[in-house]
Design a protein with these regions (language model features):
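C-terminal output helix
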Residues: 91, 109-117, 214, 232-242
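Receiver (REC) domain switch/output surface
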Residues: 103, 114-124, 237-250
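Short amphipathic alpha-helix used as the core "switch/output" element in two-component signaling
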Residues: 66-78, 118-120, 167, 189-201
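Hydrophobic/aromatic residues positioned on beta-strands within the core alpha/beta folds
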Residues: 84-85, 207
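Two-component/phosphorelay signaling modules centered on CheY-like receiver
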Residues: 14-34, 137-157
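CheY-like receiver
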Residues: 116, 124-148, 157, 248-272
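Acidic, metal-coordinating helix/loop segments flanking the phosphotransfer/catalytic sites
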Residues: 21, 35-53, 61, 158-176, ...
Length: 272
């Protein structure tokens, strides 16, 4: 059972802090809540407690974005930074990315938004064991790189074929498996079944060329929680992983994708 988190609410407005604190208490009565009205109080709180989720107003007085980034990287690398704002300024996704934010949400904050973030924290605060099964070395390397760009923390093991995948699954834990449908030595769906039998809570993403929706739905029979069509980029795999764990995909990631469509990175399925 995941322990209740420590939530830091940093906002100059007392009513906003109170409303957010009450919402958190409704959703997770065990959560510990710390408040800060300015940057000085924020830094003291970050130094004095292990904060799991930081809700911070983008206009908090005496605040330095570099301090938030430093805490995100060294104080609690698994901590979530959520920027809160009355309106979205131009280039807000780039600003959010610079401070290592997980998401940006607009005031007033409703229980639905807060609940989604608390649910995300329960998964993102843990190190997850991931098994990547694909005959292509370049593909496995790219999947590892893309997963490393996400807010998830993965311990990744790789297998080029189904038999190695089954052996690895029997030898250690699996929280997420990403399995290419066309394996050279063993039916991929049989691999999915074996992993599902051994690790019933594991999320299993099948991947490969696009298939019909009806076939995608049939994959659930074999324990698959989703299908990731190739070629894919960071947005696609990040969204699929969020959905496989039942999590809402951050608005920020969607916005960053829109900004970067003209500067697309490498995709699986291209010559690497």
């Amino acid at each position: 059972v995941t322990a209740s988190p420590t939530i830091l609410i940093a906002d100059p407005d007392e009513e906003t802090r109170l409303a957010l604190a009450e919402a958190v208490a409704r959703l997770d009565p065990g959560a510990r809540i710390v408040e800060a009205a300015d940057g000085g109080a924020l830094n003291r709180a970050l130094a004095g407690s292990r904060i799991d989720v930081l809700f911070i107003d983008v206009l908090l007085p005496q605040t330095n974005g570099a301090d938030i980034r430093r805490w995100r990287e060294t104080g609690n690398p698994r901590g979530l930074v959520v920027l809160v704002t009355d309106m979205l300024a131009p280039r807000w996704p780039a600003t959010a990315r610079r401070v290592g934010a997980y998401d940006v949400i607009l005031k007033p904050l409703g229980d639905l938004h807060i609940g989604r973030l608390l649910a995300a924290n329960q998964v993102l605060s843990r190190s997850l064991d991931c098994l990547v099964v694909d005959p292509g070395q370049a593909t496995r390397t790219l999947v590892r790189k893309l997963l490393g760009q996400s807010h998830f923390a993965f311990r990744i093991r790789e297998a080029a074929g189904g038999r190695d995948a089954v052996r690895l699954a029997e030898a250690g834990p699996v929280d997420l498996a990403i399995i290419e449908l066309s394996l050279p030595d063993y039916p991929a769906l049989e691999v999915a079944c074996r992993i599902n039998d051994r690790h019933p809570a594991a999320r299993i993403l099948m991947t490969g060329p696009r298939i019909e929706e009806g076939v995608q739905r049939q994959l659930a029979t074999f324990g698959a929680s989703g299908f990731l069509p190739k070629p894919f980029q960071f947005f696609d795999i990040d969204k699929a992983v969020h959905e496989s764990f039942g999590l809402w995909h951050p608005y920020l990631i969607n916005a960053l994708r829109r900004e970067s469509l003209l500067d697309a990175g490498p995709t699986v399925g291209q010559v690497v």
